[in-house]
């Protein structure tokens, strides 16, 4: 498998990759899985499945990565499947699948594959993949609209959540004091603050905040995360006259996520470009009423409104009303969230792998999976 980031990484793609590798390694026929991560934002620590070979000597260096990939190709024993965890790595993954003579599976997350790739070679190779795994129906539809890949080759595998790690808890008192949130009504969004992620909806929440204050004098907007777009958002909050109602936490450790979710009365992310949105699952698992967009993959994370409230991010009144409606809901994990549990994810992935492998007469047994992301 060729992948961008996984063990030690932040964000939804890294989380998906970790779950994907664990689920593949639990397949009864998987003797070994080899993963080539491209980057790691943190040190690669922690336990890995016994049958996972996680190649780390080429992290964060393009030339060393290419060398490691080439060395891996030359030393391949019999493998049965090549998985490409990000469309940017498709040329490498395709080369590996051709070399080994095995099927190639591409994983699609979100906007990275909603339109033709800037690399024309990638667009040509896309037509040659044997299967595609998409985290949502939205991403599958957007990908199919330009790629020409047939629907029977495109499988849906939504993200999953650890329902033991993320669970409801009372508000964390030290964090309440640190961020001066005692006796406040807290709206929360968690995500990277970068210009390429402006689709997540930070601006939309800021723009309705003055109107919410008229109804909720103690409301505060908690923005969890960091990035170069932070100064722009701070300036926008000032220009809207709500700077004193917006708290920027900066980057938080993964170990503190649950504690930060506990601070929220509503989790709100009215996005336009989410392929799925793992943060929705995390918030709901922690029992936080959740507001998402009906225009992107967020609606699938909320099971089309079964688990939370859907709004149109282009309609500020709708966003405001969605937040107000969510504040009327009682905290607690919604029924039906176990649809996104890891065991359910594992079963879905095993079924997809069995179908992909059985479709290829030369790949009846999974002896080795090469993962490229």
Go through the PLM ranges and name each one.
Residues 231-252:
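Nucleotide-activated donor-binding/catalytic signature segment of Leloir-type glycosyltransferases, i.e.
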Residues 289-292:
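Short hydrophobic beta-strand element within catalytic cores of glycosyltransferases
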Residues 2, 181-200, 206-209:
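Conserved donor-binding/catalytic core segment of Leloir-type glycosyltransferases
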Residues 304-305, 309-316, 325-329:
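Conserved acidic donor-binding segment of nucleotide-sugar-dependent glycosyltransferases
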Residues 84-90:
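Short His-centered aromatic/hydrophobic patch
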Residues 272:
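Aromatic "clamp/platform" in nucleotide-sugar-dependent glycosyltransferases that forms part
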Residues 126, 251-252, 259-264:
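Short alpha-helical donor nucleotide-sugar binding micro-motif in glycosyltransferases
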Residues 138, 160:
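Carbohydrate-associated surface elements
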């Amino acid at each position: 498998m060729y992948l961008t980031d996984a063990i030690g990484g932040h964000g939804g793609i890294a989380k998906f990759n970790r779950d994907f590798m664990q689920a593949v390694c639990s397949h009864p026929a998987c003797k070994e899985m080899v993963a080539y991560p491209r980057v790691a934002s943190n040190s690669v620590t922690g336990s890995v499945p016994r049958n996972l070979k996680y190649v780390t000597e080429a992290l964060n260096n393009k030339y060393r990565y290419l060398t490691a990939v080439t060395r891996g190709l030359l030393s391949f024993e019999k493998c049965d499947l090549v998985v490409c965890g990000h469309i940017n790595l498709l040329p490498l993954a395709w080369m590996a699948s051709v070399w080994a003579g095995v099927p190639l599976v591409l994983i699609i997350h979100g906007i990275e594959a909603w339109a033709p790739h800037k690399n024309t070679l990638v667009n040509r190779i896309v037509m040659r993949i044997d299967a595609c795994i998409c985290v949502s129906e939205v991403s599958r539809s957007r990908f199919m609209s330009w790629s020409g890949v047939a629907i029977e080759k495109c499988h849906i595998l939504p993200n999953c959540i650890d329902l033991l790690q993320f669970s409801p808890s009372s508000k964390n008192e030290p964090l309440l004091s640190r961020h001066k949130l005692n006796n406040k009504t807290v709206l929360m969004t968690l995500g990277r603050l970068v210009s390429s992620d402006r689709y997540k909806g930070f601006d939309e929440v800021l723009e309705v905040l003055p109107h919410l204050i008229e109804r909720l004098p103690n409301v505060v907007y908690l923005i969890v995360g960091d990035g170069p777009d932070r100064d722009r958002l701070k300036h926008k909050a000032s220009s809207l006259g709500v700077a004193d109602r917006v708290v920027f936490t900066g980057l938080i450790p993964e170990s503190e996520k649950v504690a930060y979710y506990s601070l929220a009365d509503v989790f709100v992310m009215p996005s336009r470009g989410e392929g799925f949105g793992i943060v929705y699952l995390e918030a709901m698992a922690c029992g936080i009423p959740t507001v998402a967009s009906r225009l992107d993959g967020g609606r699938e994370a909320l099971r089309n409104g079964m688990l939370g409230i859907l709004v149109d991010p282009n309609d500020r009144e709708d966003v405001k009303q969605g937040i107000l409606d969510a504040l009327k809901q009682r905290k607690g994990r919604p029924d039906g969230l176990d649809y996104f549990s890891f065991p359910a994810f594992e079963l879905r992935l095993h079924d997809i792998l069995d179908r992909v492998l059985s479709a290829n007469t030369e790949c009846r047994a999974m002896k080795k999976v090469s993962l490229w992301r």
